[in-house]
Regions:
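N-terminal secretory signal peptides that target proteins for export/translocation
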Residues: 1-5
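Beta-propeller blade termini and top-face loops
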Residues: 25-417
Length: 417
């Protein structure tokens, strides 16, 4: 026991150097400086915004898309929809009605302002805008008094030839309603189709195989504070065979003969003779004491010479003033898509519809669709919840909601107005 005690001080002296003094310990970590934060970027996580009213893509490019907001401008993605940037914020108007990209020059993008989906909380526009750098910057190209531009079509080989479908403000009669055409890239415009001051253009389509052939839907519509008056003798279907310079109204031969409302179109890219037209009828209910037609979808298989009523299903054109948009698959004239509150598909030329359940649909309250003419599997749909992209012909969807703002109501304080 005495030997063990004698070694204890020696062991203590040997162990002591193994414990470093406090002064020799590592210094405390320095506070992060500005250089540490430069690699970090803010990411928006909400709240989510309002509806989108227009959509477009670039032929053959699965990564680049554009969407137009009801009151939040134009947004662009270059990574397939994962990240989006607003590119229209510098402009004095943010309500977008139509988008189109020139097939012959992907840098040329057109935006028509003024939402054409009619209901109580919509904004009018201030003309048509053009971008020559892929939607990064914009120039006002006129048509400031057209109110709402529902559709833009561009000549497939000449980006300077453009037609714009102008609905008008729709709050009353005005002369700036109809189809406008430019051949100099928007420097000058000609009103090539004008029915009357009460009627504007609701849709416009160009034959994919022959740009001299176009169809236009015209809509007699007036918005009131208590509702709207849709329909009248001004509404109808028109055709041009000279590139939109002159137009002929298509009457009879199977088309409705009684007054009707909104007209919307769908052309089959793979069959230039196949034309679909959606017409807002009264579904047989009298209008202003007059009988009305009953039907939703008509079809021509001979370029508009004769027509047949194909479908009365309201999933084709229910709540016509707010929806009424369709598209035909570029590789199958019988495959058509119909956008309303629901999302419906036909594979038999419009005779029957399959309505996708909400979980399988792009969204709800659908407003616009763009299909890549070279790859029908690739589509983008704009709707009230945002936008949805598919690479699988609609079997699966990638859904996105953006932080675009929209004002629905304004009020004042009764005590301090």
């Amino acid at each position: 026991m005495r030997i063990a005690r004698r070694w204890l001080p020696v062991l203590a002296l040997v162990a002591a150097p193994l414990v470093p003094p406090l002064a020799a310990q590592a210094p405390a970590a320095a506070r992060p400086g500005a250089e540490h934060w430069r690699a970090l970027h803010w990411r928006n996580i909400g709240p989510e915004g309002n509806r989108f009213s227009a959509a477009a893509g670039i032929v053959g490019d699965p990564l680049t898309y554009f969407v137009g907001s009801a009151s939040g401008g134009v947004w662009k993605t270059t990574d397939g929809g994962v990240n989006w940037r607003p590119t229209f914020d510098a402009q004095p108007v943010q309500s977008i009605g139509a988008l189109a990209v020139a097939r012959s020059d992907r840098n040329v993008v057109w935006a028509g302002t003024g939402e054409a989906h009619i209901r109580s909380h919509i904004s009018i526009g201030q003309g048509i805008y053009k971008s020559v750098d892929g939607g990064e910057s914009w120039l006002l190209m006129g048509l400031e008094r057209t109110g709402r531009i529902a559709r833009i079509v561009i000549h497939p080989a000449d980006p300077d030839v453009v037609l714009a479908c102008a609905l008008g403000t729709a709050y009353g009669p005005q002369p700036e309603r109809g189809v406008y055409r430019t051949t100099d890239g928007g420097a000058t415009w000609a009103l090539v189709l004008h029915v009357d001051a009460n009627t504007g253009c609701s849709d416009l389509a160009m034959d994919a195989t022959n740009p001299r052939v176009l169809y236009a839907g015209m809509w007699q519509i007036e918005i009131h504070t208590w509702g709207r008056t849709s329909g009248g003798p001004g509404s109808g279907l028109f055709k041009s065979i000279d590139g939109g310079v002159t137009w002929t109204r298509l009457r009879g031969n199977g088309l409705p003969t009684r007054p009707h409302g909104k007209v919307a179109l769908g052309l089959a890219p793979s069959d230039p003779q196949r034309v679909y037209v959606m017409i807002e009828t009264g579904d047989g209910v009298p209008w202003n004491g007059q009988p009305t037609e009953d039907g939703q979808l008509w079809r021509s298989d001979n370029g508009g010479r004769t027509w047949a009523l194909i479908n009365k299903d309201r999933n084709v054109m229910g709540r016509a003033h707010y929806y009424s948009r369709m598209a035909v698959a570029p590789d199958d004239p019988d495959e058509a898509y119909f956008l309303t509150a629901s999302y419906a598909k036909s594979i038999d030329g419009g005779r029957t519809l399959t309505v996708l359940p909400r979980a399988q649909a792009p969204g709800g309250d659908h407003h616009d669709i763009w299909i890549d003419p070279t790859n029908p599997d690739r589509q983008i749909v704009a709707h009230d919840q945002g936008l949805s992209i598919t690479q699988t012909r609609g079997r699966t969807w990638f859904r996105q909601r953006l932080s675009n703002a929209q004002l629905y109501h304004v009020t004042v304080d009764n005590a301090i107005p």
